[in-house]
Amino acid sequence: MNRDKRFELIARANSERICGIAERILDDAATAVEVVKKPVCGMIMMRFRDTAEKCVFNIGEVLVTEAEVRIGSELGYAMVMGRDAEAALAGAIIDAAVESGHPLTPEIIDLLRSEEERLKEELQKTWAEVATTKVDFEVMA
């Protein structure tokens, strides 16, 4: 799993699951976690690509929380939507753990893959609900 994909999944993952594995990393006496940037809230511009003309435009600002940590020489970073300092810090810890080759890395990757599957299922469910509202203009004519 590449780092971009990991960032995306950490940002959208269930915060309880992310925080649980981050706690286990913190409990490991052999792993020293240094907080480089405490969780801070900020705003980012959410961008969207128009499906018809393929042009990008700004929808509006979104509240996010970001954090950065270091494990050994490896930096970990995470940004999550909303005001959730615990999830941002946990995400950064998980990212740094994977980058540093922490013993829990395989379990972290498994957790992120299961979150990816859950997110895909949620998206399919949403599309199925939206499909029932689709109007077929050919039939109406």
Predicted features and spans:
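Charge-rich, low-complexity N-terminal segments
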Residues: 1-27
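A generic short-segment signal for beta-strand/edge and adjacent turn/coil regions
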Residues: 1-4, 13, 33-40, 45-48, ...
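Short, functionally important structural connectors and interaction interfaces within domains
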Residues: 2, 51-54, 127-129
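Short secondary-structure boundary micro-motifs
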Residues: 8, 17-19, 39, 50-54, ...
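Structured beta-strand/loop patches that form or line metal/cofactor-binding pockets in enzymes
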Residues: 26-71, 77-78
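Cysteine/selenocysteine-centered motifs that mediate thiol-based redox chemistry or coordinate metal-sulfur cofactors
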Residues: 29, 99-141
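A broadly conserved detector of short glycine/acidic/proline-rich loop/turn motifs that flank catalytic sites
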Residues: 49, 82, 141
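A hydrophobic, small-residue-rich beta->alpha segment in the mid-to-C-terminal subdomain
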Residues: 74-110
